[in-house]
Amino acid sequence: MKIEAVPGAPQDGEFEFVLAAEKEFEEIISISHGIYGGLDYLPSRYHSWINEKDRMVVLAKKDGTVIGLLSVFVVDGGETALLEGLRVAPWERGRGVAGVLQRFCIKLVKHRYPSVKVMRLTRDDKLSAKELTKYRVIAKQGILLLSFNAPDLASRLSSIPLPPAASRPPPPIELTPEDVRDVFLERGGLLKDLLPNQTIIQDWQPFQALPGNQDLLRRKTLCWMVDDLIQPQVATLCTAPFPVPAGPLCFYLNIDVFGSELQSVQEQLLSHLHAHVPKLPADVRCQLFLPPNLWRPMADFCTLVLGLHLEKGYTEQYLLEADI
């Protein structure tokens, strides 16, 4: 779908910018091979993204061929533009396509949504000195990437050796829709002491704990857990598993962790695994985003106690912000 003329947008005769449609799906998948180490979420989300309210999925084309994609999602009551899903065709990488596409998308979102004040994005690689001057770092989390075979783990979950019940924290509490509503009170409500900058980071997507984001997150299939309803020290947010290109029948399980009480994090991880693993058919990539100081003890727990495979060493997720 053609995009209207956007005042101030980059003018480059080489590129045509259009809104993505169903017909471009296969072409986009063909330029996405190897993206995000086989954990690319776009194949599972593309069809809903192109129809989602307040989201624009913008394609860059050259000679009629798709060479780049970037999604812009307006959240936080119309004040924030989330930049997601960036990719450039392999033969065009290193030629400035990503920068041109990002600049166009920023002009487009400001043209359509004048209330937008900042852009936010998440990254999982080291930031250059130039990037550190361009963006504010709003939050930093450790990334723990694990893998396992679901039927194998399901057969072992009930027999995993754990400390005696008397020395373990109380069982995790799954939040009801009414409890979740309390998360979106002023300054994060129930979770105000746990959220980085009052921001809920859900599977790479940052949302401020504002009433305007409540319905948006309620539409997702999420499981929220806390260790205590009055004064939680740990909260976790698990996204429903979805298929990824890492392998045949491979599913991705994402768990975002807020809080640093180790035993409560372990208990909540086990509860999420009990809920999802028995329903999955084969291999799983499980990614936990957690406070950096928890990475090593949780890596040891997952490998030595749960018998999961550590896919890679310590890396970090950065939540970045810039005024626009």
UniProtKB/Swiss-Prot annotation:
Enzyme Commission no: 2.3.1.33
UniProt cross-references to SUPFAM superfamilies, sorted A to Z: Acyl-CoA N-acyltransferases (Nat)
CDD domains hit by this protein: NAT_SF
Pfam families: Acetyltransf_1, Hisat_C
Catalytic activity of the protein: L-histidine + acetyl-CoA = N(alpha)-acetyl-L-histidine + CoA + H(+)
Domain N-acetyltransferase: from-to ranges: 15-151
Keywords attached to this entry: Acyltransferase, Transferase
Origin superkingdom: Eukaryota
InterPro entries (UniProt xref): Acyl_CoA_acyltransferase, GNAT_dom, Hisat_C
GO molecular function: L-histidine N-acetyltransferase activity
First-tier enzyme category under EC: transferase
Purpose: Enzyme responsible for the N-acetyl-histidine (NAH) synthesis, which is a major constituent of brain and lens of ectothermic vertebrates.
Misc. comment: Strong histidine N-acetyltransferase activity has been detected in ectothermic vertebrates and not in endothermic birds and mammals.
Stated name of the protein: Histidine N-acetyltransferase
Lineage: Eukaryota, Metazoa, Chordata, Craniata, Vertebrata
Gene field: hisat
